[in-house]
Amino acid sequence: MNNVEGTETTAKKKPSLKDEVFDWMLEIVTAVVILLLIFTFALRTVDVYGNSMLPTLHHGEKLLLNRFLYTPEYGDIVVLTKPCKGDEPLIKRIIATENQTVDIDFQKGIVYVDGVALEENYILEPTTRSFDVTFPCVVPEGCVFVLGDNRNNSKDSRDSTVGMVDERYILGEVVFRITPFEKMGKIGW
């Protein structure tokens, strides 16, 4: 009569090894699916090829892009594709967005947007190299005007083979430098 009426003794059942393995596998599969969804729809990695973005980005660096709900703005560093360039992505800085007027004084190396000279402390040297695009030019609706930070060693919107970039060709905004590890961190200006 050690049992008091109304109380029950319940022993917790230890989960079997099979149940524990199943729980672990379910958590791993869930984590992998979540990571795949994030890297499919929100983030992407890309490598820097070439020197057109010096001094900001260097050849061989690995970058992380934000692809989720992105709206292009002046100063953003973006990765884009162009039908004429095949699958090779280009990394450039947005200088102007739709309906803005871009003018470049190649003698003085100054870029103007809507008549205002840009303060460009991020460029390697002033813009003295011209291509076949005539200035001033107005950025069409749904497009952006991009330049490399290494202005005199960059194929960008000054060249008609790149030209004004339709926003649909922007893969995403560069938000983070992954490698080299000593320079790892947020990309900003």
Task: Identify the meaning behind each predicted range.
Residues 61, 73-76, 100-101, 108-110, 143, 169, ...:
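Structural motif
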Residues 92-103:
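RNA pseudouridine synthases
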Residues 1-89, 165-189:
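Protein maturation boundaries and topogenic segments
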Residues 112-115:
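Short strand-turn-strand beta-turns centered on an Asx-Gly dipeptide
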Residues 126-130:
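Short gly/ser/thr-rich secondary-structure transition/capping motifs
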Residues 133, 137-189:
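Beta-strand-rich cores of mature extracytoplasmic or soluble domains
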